[in-house]
């Protein structure tokens, strides 16, 4: 298993393809699996790898919480497609000072029993909350205006990037291109969200992260269902 060399374009392409139908490396919530792969990537993937870029920006937003994310961080070869081998070079093998700080949490060998216990408790609490289904789920129908930079922006690619955003409680609907003048068209796209899971701020943050295509995003209509 693996993604090839995640520091190379080929490795990032494997990661992008892997995330085409997934929100996370493993499971349905961010975990130490995402942290392990995130650490191996040199920086934000290029805009044309919209699935990988969407995932990268999402995991980056968990920077302060990464040490407490559930799961156990494993070697890169434990993640990814089964038919691809991990060849990513680890920068930690060349030099590792005693004063180095692991921003994403301790290594498994150094992790204290107390830290393990707390992490397992958090995971159990999350699973317990997830199992309790609310009697009524509040939903909203939102119409978004997504504006490109100019008339040369690839609107098909822009829409692909927008629809690549996946989240629990988010369902994309119909869309159309609407002229705004000077040959420029904006993307008007419908979505239905669960109010306690997805907000317009989150949508705006993730959509405008595709900055090579998107100039801005506005809420054109918002209706409770």
Swiss-Prot record:
Covalent link Glycyl lysine isopeptide (Lys-Gly) (interchain with G-Cter in SUMO2), residues: 147
Biological processes annotated in GO: translational elongation
Sites of Phosphothreonine modification: 88, 93
Residue numbers carrying N6-acetyllysine: 7
Xref: InterPro entries: eEF-1beta-like_sf, EF1B_bsu/dsu, EF1B_bsu/dsu_GNE, Glutathione-S-Trfase_C_sf, Transl_elong_EF1B/ribsomal_bS6, Transl_elong_EF1B_B/D_CS
Modified residues (Phosphoserine): 8, 42, 95, 106, 174
Spans annotated as Disordered: 79-98
PROSITE patterns xref list: EF1BD_1 (PS00824), EF1BD_2 (PS00825)
UniProt keyword terms in alphabetical order: Acetylation, Elongation factor, Isopeptide bond, Phosphoprotein, Protein biosynthesis, Ubl conjugation
Residue pairs linked by disulfide bridges in the UniProt entry: none
Pfam families referenced in this protein's UniProt entry, alphabetically: EF1_GNE
GO molecular function: guanyl-nucleotide exchange factor activity; translation elongation factor activity
GST C-terminal domain location: 1-90
Entry's Gene Ontology cellular component terms: cytosol; eukaryotic translation elongation factor 1 complex
PANTHER family: EF-HAND AND COILED-COIL DOMAIN-CONTAINING FAMILY MEMBER, ELONGATION FACTOR 1-BETA
Record-stated family: Belongs to the EF-1-beta/EF-1-delta family.
Subunit structure: EF-1 is composed of 4 subunits: alpha, beta (alpha subunit of the eEF1B subcomplex), delta (beta subunit of the eEF1B subcomplex), and gamma (gamma subunit of the eEF1B subcomplex). Interacts with elongation factor EEF1A1.
Function: Catalytic subunit of the guanine nucleotide exchange factor (GEF) (eEF1B subcomplex) of the eukaryotic elongation factor 1 complex (eEF1). Stimulates the exchange of GDP for GTP on elongation factor 1A (eEF1A), probably by displacing GDP from the nucleotide binding pocket in eEF1A.
Stated name of the protein: Elongation factor 1-beta
Organism of derivation: Sus scrofa (Pig)
High-level lineage: Eukaryota, Metazoa, Chordata, Craniata, Vertebrata
Gene (UniProt): EEF1B
């Amino acid at each position: 298993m693996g993604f090839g060399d995640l520091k190379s374009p080929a490795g990032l392409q494997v990661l992008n393809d892997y995330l085409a139908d997934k929100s996370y490396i493993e499971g349905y919530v961010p975990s130490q699996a995402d942290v392990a792969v995130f650490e191996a990537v040199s920086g934000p993937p290029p805009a044309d790898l919209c699935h990988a870029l969407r995932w990268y920006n999402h995991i980056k937003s968990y920077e302060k919480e990464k040490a407490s994310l559930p799961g156990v961080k494993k070697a890169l070869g434990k993640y990814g497609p089964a038919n691809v081998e991990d060849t990513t070079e680890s920068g930690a093998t060349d030099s590792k000072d005693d004063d180095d700080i692991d921003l994403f949490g301790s290594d498994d060998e150094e992790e204290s029993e107390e830290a393990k216990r707390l992490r397992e408790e958090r995971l159990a609490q999350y699973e317990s909350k997830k199992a309790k289904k609310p009697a009524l789920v509040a939903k909203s129908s939102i119409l978004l205006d997504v504006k490109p930079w100019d008339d040369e922006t690839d609107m098909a690619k822009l829409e692909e990037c927008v629809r690549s955003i996946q989240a629990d409680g988010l369902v994309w609907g119909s869309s159309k291109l609407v002229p705004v003048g000077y040959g420029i068209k904006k993307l008007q796209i419908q979505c239905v969200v669960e109010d306690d899971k997805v907000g317009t701020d989150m949508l705006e943050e993730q959509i405008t992260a595709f900055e090579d295509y998107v100039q801005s995003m506005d809420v054109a209509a918002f209706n409770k269902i």
